[in-house]
Amino acid sequence: MFTPLITTISLILGPTLHPEIVAAQDQLKSPSEIEKLSYDDAIARVNDILAEENSTNDIRPECHSIMKDHGKKTDKAVVLIHGVSGCPAHFAELADKFYNEGYNVFIPRMPKHGLTDNNRHGEVTLAELASFAEQTTSILSGLGEEAGVAGSSGGSSVATWIAQYGKGTVKKLLLLEPFYATYDKFQNTLVKKVYGWNLLPDILINGNLSLRALGKYLLLVDSYKSDMYAPGVESISVILSEGDKGIDHNEAANVSKKMADSSGAEYQYVELPKSMGLEHGIINPGDPLVIPHKEKLYDMYYKAYTGEKVSALAESNTIEDTETEEEQPSQLSELSLVLEQ
């Protein structure tokens, strides 16, 4: 009974109190024409971003945007997009693998992320996410003849948008632990409709994860095309951990599979087994849970990005066609405790 009530309240108060969020939603659903850039113009845009970041002391040294290029437009290029509360350092080592294979690689820093005060990622606005997605797509268009995107968690949410609205820019799509929804539907509604619309003060869960930021990414997910069509996309690979308690696994599978079917793209969905000890966060090279598996994981991610069929590193579920399963135990346990108070 509470979910319809929350939705009704947000529909009344949200647009009234925050018309800027309505405008950002419109921008995401009907973006301006994505500007296709030459290599020189794309690098100039990146250099502007780097110069702006270098002009402030607010960004942690390891969290500046990263550009690894070969001095020319290459046959292949990739953009790597970090997750909510993360920063480009999470993709730095995987970027080396792509670069050594001849790719131009860009790892942009999400707005309000990677700051010395990491709690400020909760200040990110939906308009900033929209502008970030558009600018990143334009830069990608100039870096390589065949371009693609890989994202982690909320970065996969943005990568999915870029694939759909990038006017054919994206050919390859790698979605690591894509954040399309929290598992519990009530939690998902509350985070999106209340915190996404800034109707309550922000709360940090797990020590440094902003509910307002999570809500903005969920609002971005609402902007996806109803048919999920992603023009030009040739392959979509999804990888997550069975032990991930931060996202809805069914949504991760069903949303991505619908996009692949609608776009005529090759598709694979792989869950890493719980025996690996991985949770939500399967990319950060400094994560103690990732370190023991890092070399094999990164090799898997690279192969999956290229469209090569991969299997998990041990016995696991590898799913080609995933239907919605019966209800599972509630996830985001700390979020549950916060919301019940």
Describe each region flagged by the PLM.
Residues 59-110:
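Short, surface-exposed "cap/lid" segments of acyl-processing enzymes
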Residues 94, 248-260:
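Short alpha-helix in the alpha/beta-hydrolase fold that links the catalytic acid
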Residues 115-143:
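Catalytic nucleophile-loop/oxyanion-hole region of alpha/beta-hydrolase
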Residues 150-155, 159:
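Gly/Ala-rich beta-loop-alpha elbow adjacent to hydrolase catalytic centers
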Residues 168-215:
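Hydrolase active-site cap/lid region
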Residues 232, 238-241:
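Short beta-strand/loop motif that positions the catalytic acidic residue
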Residues 243-247:
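Acidic catalytic loop of the alpha/beta-hydrolase fold
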Residues 282-332, 338:
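Catalytic active-site module of serine/aspartate enzymes centered on a nucleophile-bearing elbow/loop
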